[in-house]
Amino acid sequence: MDLSTSGSLPCHLPLSLLTNLQTPPIDTSFSSPPATSSSSLLSPSPSSAFRPVVPKSLMNPQPAMDTFYMSAIQSLVVSTTNDDQYSEHGALEGSKSLAKDENASTSAGTILCQVCSDKASGFHYGVFACEGCKGFFRRSIQQKITYRACTRAEDCLILRNNRNRCQCCRLKKCLAVGMSRDAVRFGRVPKREKARMFEEMQKTNVQSQRDQIAIQYENLTEVMHKINQAFGTLQATLEKCTGPIYTDRCPITSNFIVIPLKAAIDFANSIPAFLSITQTQRVHLLQNSVFDVMLLASASASTSQHFPPGGLTYDQSSANPIIPQAIQSISARIRQLPPQTVPILTAIAVCQADLLPESQQPMLLAERLWCVLGKLGGIQSLATAPSLLADVRTLRQWHSDRLRQMSQISQHFSQNLLIAPVAAAAPVLLPPAFLSPPASATSTSSSSVKSEFIERHPSIASLLERPRRISSSGAQEPLNLSLPHVRHQVKRDVDSDEQLEEMKVSPVPTTLSE
């Protein structure tokens, strides 16, 4: 089947392995189970003294991505300072008692300043605030300072790293969150009131997180430079790690998996505000989006050098035709997008909100990336991107199902090699030379080894030529006396020994004949 009508298929897709592996045909329907169920394929054979015990890990194979793939992502995702705060939150979770001091530690985590989202030092002027905002508000009220008017329509984002940029908007936000000179409290805040204030503070944390993300996307040029640079590095890494699939099979080694995986994680880390997500959440997002990232990066790369002029042709009997055709169609749609929008679309695939529905931060990050995509690609990109990401997600599920089926077949094949000899009726799976080696090859190899040994040790060559002396210690294997010809042979040996003992003559080696 020729797929050249819809464009060439990128060779360094994760599914490029499936178009080259010579496996038995598998049912192309993903809705109905195959004719031979996995339970029947993996059912253990009857126990026998000539068959080894197969480990349970082979009888119950895990999914393809549950071992090396998952552990590699967990080891490659680095921890950040935010993880320490959330680990403290995990240690304090479940405790109903609040902290005794005015510090930020409570049963729900760290309390942030309601003005700049920095770590709050206590309850100041009616709100939780940091030392910087507390001092700024006190100076502004006591000295009655009139600040210069804002040049950005009084709509500046006030965060920890830019709170001194616009003092007019900072004072305005102090008043907006409820800071008042009359609300100053001396002494300790009661626990009940502090708990109530903290609940209200939790409601405003979403807005604070949105502001923290938005401040990192103010400079659109810098954002695009970071993402495009990491995206180009990812494409170059994928091209180096794989070769042309129409000339040789793709190698399945640790470098073949780890190096592209590290490049995909580096691309995710280049997304502004992505490292502000906790390590556990980033691992979960990457485990469910690495395939999407590699597919989008591969489809948008230049792959003309990896394919013959007539396009890519594959054997229908050795691959599932649905998956290559789907990749071909999605790749053509990706190449029709504006080039500057593909890196942003890939970043959106990493931060999809449905991959981590319990967290607000990935959803807020995805919202900001959608805004960037709209500015770069316009309404057309916003209209086509959701359906494209949905199709990529469906293809990811097909890919997982395909690998799981291949894993079951390979495990069943390994069991047949361990449990029972392979029948001669399967020349496709094993070469004939492996199934039944010729006898001439065995005799030739054994004789050549013996001759080489004699040449290296001429001093014992004569010993090898002498007839073997039969030991009289009785250390030979016990004979089965139930056989008639064995009983006759034993009787003749006993009579011969008695005659020799009577004659007092040393026995002379003779050749017995039936």
UniProtKB/Swiss-Prot annotation:
Record domain NR LBD: where: 216-514
GO cellular component, one term: nucleus
One GO process term, biological-process aspect: negative regulation of transcription by RNA polymerase II
Coiled coil region boundaries: none
PROSITE patterns: NR_LBD (PS51843), NUCLEAR_REC_DBD_1 (PS00031), NUCLEAR_REC_DBD_2 (PS51030)
Keywords of the record: DNA-binding, Metal-binding, Nucleus, Receptor, Transcription, Transcription regulation, Zinc, Zinc-finger
Region (Disordered): 28-48, 465-514
ZnF region ranges: NR C4-type: 113-133, 150-174
Compartments, record wording: Nucleus
UniProt KW DNA-binding keyword: yes
Main location (coarse class): nucleus
Top-rank lineage group of the source organism: Eukaryota
DNA-binding region(s), chain positions: 110-186
One Pfam family linked to the record: zf-C4
Keyword Nucleotide-binding: no
Gene Ontology molecular function, alphabetical: nuclear receptor activity; RNA polymerase II cis-regulatory region sequence-specific DNA binding; zinc ion binding
Similarity remark: Belongs to the nuclear hormone receptor family.
Function recorded in the entry: Orphan nuclear receptor.
The name this protein goes by in its record: Nuclear hormone receptor family member nhr-85
Name of the gene encoding the protein in the UniProt record: nhr-85
